[in-house]
Amino acid sequence: MRRKEKEITDKYALEKIIGQSLVCRLAMSDGNTPYVVPLCFGYQGGTIYVHGSPRGKKIDMLRKNQNVCLEFDRNTKVIDAEKACDWSMQYQSVIGFGKASFVTDLDEKRKALDIIMGQYSNRAFHFPENMVRMTAVISIEITSMTGKQSGFEDQ
């Protein structure tokens, strides 16, 4: 990272940013064609879980190439100033790299869906078997991640 003073290396701090993020941006590629989608997600033990339709561009791309990049951010705010060149942004972000795989076991899919819902709610949910079968669940094992922050006094 070029700006070492903005780098976040502490694993707990990185996981806290992920845990407090509302959106995971999943980047994939098909040859020379990049594709990014914002998704609801869940995080547990170094793995990101996402879900969606079993058909579509995201699914097609992940079947061809399981290598992905992830982005999470929180505490984003524009910091204005008198001069244009002094404007800035406050943020904390995490970029992660990993490998995606499809979860097919029904019990594992339910666990992943619980983890996803746990990102947004403290409630327990029931997932009907027919809905679990119809839902694509993807696990992404994070192989590396880095964080960056700007606009915080404790940098």
Provide a role label for each language-model segment.
Residues R2-E5, N75-Q155:
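Charged, gly/pro-rich active-site loop segments
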Residues I17, C40-F41, D60-L62, C85-S88, ...:
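Short, conserved, surface-exposed binding loops centered on an aromatic residue
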Residues G19, R63-V68, D114-N122:
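Short, intrinsically disordered, mixed-charge
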Residues M1-Q20:
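Extreme N-terminal tail/first-helix region
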Residues V23, V36-P38, N67, Y91, ...:
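Broad gene-expression machinery/nucleic-acid interaction feature
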